[in-house]
Structures are given as C-alpha cells and as structure tokens.
Amino acid sequence: MQKETSIFLPSQVTVKVHPVVIFNILDHYIRRNVGQDRVIGTLLGFNNDGVLEIRNCFPVVHSETEQIAVEMEYQRKMLDLHLKSSPREPIIGWYATGNDINENSVHINNFYRDEMGNSTPIHLTVDTGLTNDTMGIHAYMAHNLSLNPESSLGSYFSQLPLEILTFEAENAGLESIAQTKYDQQSTSLLSELESLQGSLTKLDEMLESITSYIESVEKGEIQGDPRLGRFLAKTIQALPKANAQVMDKVINNSVKDLLMIVYLSSLTRSQLAVATKISHSLSN
C-alpha cells in the first residue's frame, strides 16, 4: 500500500471532472431513498501522466445505519457492462454527496481500493447542502499513517487540485443553464438559428475587443503581451485564405441551408400534428 501511495503524491496529481458526472451525481441524490443522508457511486475515467480525468459514473446501493454495507456485487456487474462499451474508462474512485469525510468514508474507500487491486482511489465529494450558498466540489486521496510497513495507525485524506473540464457541446448546454443563475425562471434550449446568432454576436464582440487592444498597443497606451501577440498571429495564420466575397458567399449559403432545414422541420411538425388529429378523429 505504501508503494502505491508514494506514486500518487498530492503535488503530482490533478483531477479533471466533466459536467455530466456532476449532473449524474445530483440526479442520484434527488432520487435517493427517503431518510438517506447521502449517496455514493463509482467514478470512471483514466490516468494520463498524473492527470486523472473523470468521464463517467454510476450509482451504487449502500447503507450507513448500524454498520456500513456496500453492494459491491452490483458495482461489479455495472462496471462489467460499462467496460463493454467503454473499455478505456476503468474504475478510478468513488463519489459521495455531502461535505464531510467520516469514518464510514474510510471503510468505503477501502472497499474501492480492494476493487482496484490495491491502487489508490480518488474520492469526489459534492456538497448538496450548499454550504455558504455554494455547491462545493472537491477531490481527495487517502493515505496510510504507519510507523512500519506491517502496521497502520489510520488514514487521512488530502485534497487534490480539481478542474471542471468541458467539451464544446457541453459548453453550449452549460451556457443555457447559466441563464437562470440569478432568477427562478426556466429556460429552453436555443434553436439552431438562435444559437448561430448568439455565436456570431460573441465573435463580433471578441473581434472588437481584440481590435481595441491592438490599437491601444500601437498608440503606446498599454504595454503589449508577447504571448498574446504570438497567439493572435498563430490564430490568423490558421484562418483559411479566401477573399471577402468568397467568405460571404460561403456564409450566405450556410445560412440559406439552415433556414431551409428550419422551414422543413416546421412543415414536418405541422403535418404530423394534422395526421395525429385525423387519426384521433377516425378512432373516435
């Protein structure tokens, strides 16, 4: 065990978690049994040179009444099913809701350590109690306290650096959800045309900001950042070499195609609604 711990030092490990994992944990908590204080589950992902990326998870049945009990047989069956579809995402740890790490957490962590062949599992906590009006998300790793390899005095959990890692598609969903951050109103996903308009508006704002920055540097009002300059130069070099007329034509054709898709989708919905009403009338 000490050999495993010496490999995964807190200063060498960074944990990255995808938003879908957090949403799955929250969904598990909402669907918990009556009277259950917290829920636990298995974390799935991979280790890339000290960067532990959590890509998925699934719930595990457990009980913390008189004694701790974890349905590890259920956990094994779920893991086997997952590995059939995603063989590159093995078990890397476990999650729990709440903000506390107690004695039961140590026992559950030992269960997962045994399931992982004595490797060190990652423990992810999600504070569903919203302490200080914040849903704290933290990652930990357990270490043994011992005077010699034969005996153990106990365990302690050290916190690890944690980042939320998102794909482009996930960003679109998160931006839509964030619209209701400061109010209680619901929101709906944008249509393709509205999403395109929003993206072009943001692009226009960023171009204005970059133009203003470059003009300020040229006038000597601010000092330029060489790293930013290199990044802008690399970005410009990556742009396709085409004149303005060709670019306008390509964009206009794309917009026309999108409008045609929107029109056909609306027409299809109307036809389906009419067909449903006719079918309902004939059945009566």
Curated annotation (Swiss-Prot):
Give the CDD domains listed for this entry. Answer: MPN_eIF3f
Q: What is annotated about its quaternary structure and interactions? A: Component of the eukaryotic translation initiation factor 3 (eIF-3) complex.
Q: What does this protein do?
A: Component of the eukaryotic translation initiation factor 3 (eIF-3) complex, which is involved in protein synthesis of a specialized repertoire of mRNAs and, together with other initiation factors, stimulates binding of mRNA and methionyl-tRNAi to the 40S ribosome. The eIF-3 complex specifically targets and initiates translation of a subset of mRNAs involved in cell proliferation.
Kindly list the places in or outside the cell where this protein is found, as annotated in its UniProt entry.
Answer: Cytoplasm
Keywords noted in UniProt:
Cytoplasm, Initiation factor, Protein biosynthesis
Main site of residence?
cytoplasm
Q: What family does the Swiss-Prot or TrEMBL record give for this protein?
A: Belongs to the eIF-3 subunit F family.
Name of the protein in question: Eukaryotic translation initiation factor 3 subunit F
Molecular-function GO terms, alphabetical: metallopeptidase activity; translation initiation factor activity; translation initiation factor binding
User: What biological-process GO terms show up in the record?
Assistant: formation of cytoplasmic translation initiation complex; translational initiation
Where are its TM segments located?
none
InterPro entries attached to this UniProt entry: eIF3f, EIF3F/CSN6-like_C, JAMM/MPN+_dom, MPN
Q: Domain MPN: where?
A: 15-146
Q: Which GO terms describe its cellular component?
A: eukaryotic 43S preinitiation complex; eukaryotic 48S preinitiation complex; eukaryotic translation initiation factor 3 complex; eukaryotic translation initiation factor 3 complex, eIF3m
| Keyword Transferase listed | no
